[in-house]
Amino acid sequence: MSRSSKKGPYVDIKLLDKIEAMNKANEKRVIRTWSRDSTIFPQMIGHTIAVHDGRRHVPVYITENMVGHKLGEFAPTRFFRGHGGKKADKRGKVK
């Protein structure tokens, strides 16, 4: 179920404060965050945000097309390595 439209989009307040402070100071640096559920706002365009995927922080450069989406959409948490079998064993070996 999606969020109620009367509540508005969610964004972590600390993350938004960091973005606004960087916009005022006109600086660009990577911001680490664990807030995968935060919505991307227009103020975030041009910044790089390192989103936690459960193991490490994945750098995500914010563009105009990403506005309205969630940060977690751009940092996948699961990686498909393929099904088992003889062919998979040969492909998976590191020489």
From Swiss-Prot:
Highest taxon in the source lineage: Bacteria
GO cellular component, one term: cytoplasm
Keyword tags: Ribonucleoprotein, Ribosomal protein, RNA-binding, rRNA-binding
Residue ranges of the TM segments: none
Gene Ontology molecular function, alphabetical: rRNA binding; structural constituent of ribosome
UniProt-listed GO biological process terms: ribosomal small subunit assembly; translation
One Pfam family named in its UniProt record: Ribosomal_S19
NCBIfam families: rpsS_bact (TIGR01050)
Function: Protein S19 forms a complex with S13 that binds strongly to the 16S ribosomal RNA.
Family of the protein in this entry: Belongs to the universal ribosomal protein uS19 family.
HAMAP family membership: Ribosomal_uS19
Stated name of the protein: Small ribosomal subunit protein uS19
The organism's taxonomic lineage, starting at the top: Bacteria, Bacillati, Chloroflexota, Chloroflexia, Chloroflexales
This protein's encoding gene: rpsS
